């Protein structure tokens, strides 16, 4: 199937995670991004999260690791500066002293979901054969988990009925 690209940036912040999202493991989404043009270069990010608020071991010496994602491939230094500016707006803190750790442009990150997409399609292919995957639900980690759960539940219901 066709796919969508995603680029993820990792930064080490110069402040505690508690200063960014009150120490909560919260996915930050820019609601203003979806009120204007989706390709606005000043708002490249779809979401960002303070990884070390939920997994402190992801950074050493009490550092704060931030993961931020945008649709499309954005490998340039200019893109990183736009991301940094967007992060400053989202977290309401200066980001000029944040350390850029890595950028991962992934051309085939998520399956493209053409409309209409049947998220309730059968998970049973044949007797004893079940199928799951993000492309069968919603193209995301959550979609993959939901699809896996639906398949597992269908399999268990079948096994328990015999």
What are these regions (language model features)?
Residues 1-81, 86-90:
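Mid-domain catalytic core of redox enzymes
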Residues 51, 55-162:
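Conserved flavin/dinucleotide-binding core of flavoenzymes
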């Amino acid at each position: 199937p066709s796919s969508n690209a995603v680029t993820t940036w990792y930064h080490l912040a110069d402040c505690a995670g508690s200063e960014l999202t009150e120490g909560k493991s919260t996915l930050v989404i820019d609601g203003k991004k979806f009120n204007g043009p989706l390709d606005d270069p000043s708002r490249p990010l779809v979401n960002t999260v303070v990884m070390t608020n939920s997994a402190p071991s992801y950074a050493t010496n009490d550092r704060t690791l931030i993961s931020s994602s945008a649709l499309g491939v954005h490998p340039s230094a200019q893109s990183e500066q736009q991301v940094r500016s967007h992060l400053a707006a989202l977290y309401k803190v200066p980001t000029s002293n944040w350390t850029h750790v890595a950028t991962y442009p992934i051309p085939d990150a998520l399956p493209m979901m053409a409309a209409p997409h049947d998220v309730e399609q059968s998970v049973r292919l044949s007797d004893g054969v079940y199928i799951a995957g993000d492309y069968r639900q919603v193209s995301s980690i959550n979609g993959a988990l939901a699809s896996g759960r639906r398949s597992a539940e269908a399999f268990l219901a079948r096994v328990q009925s015999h």
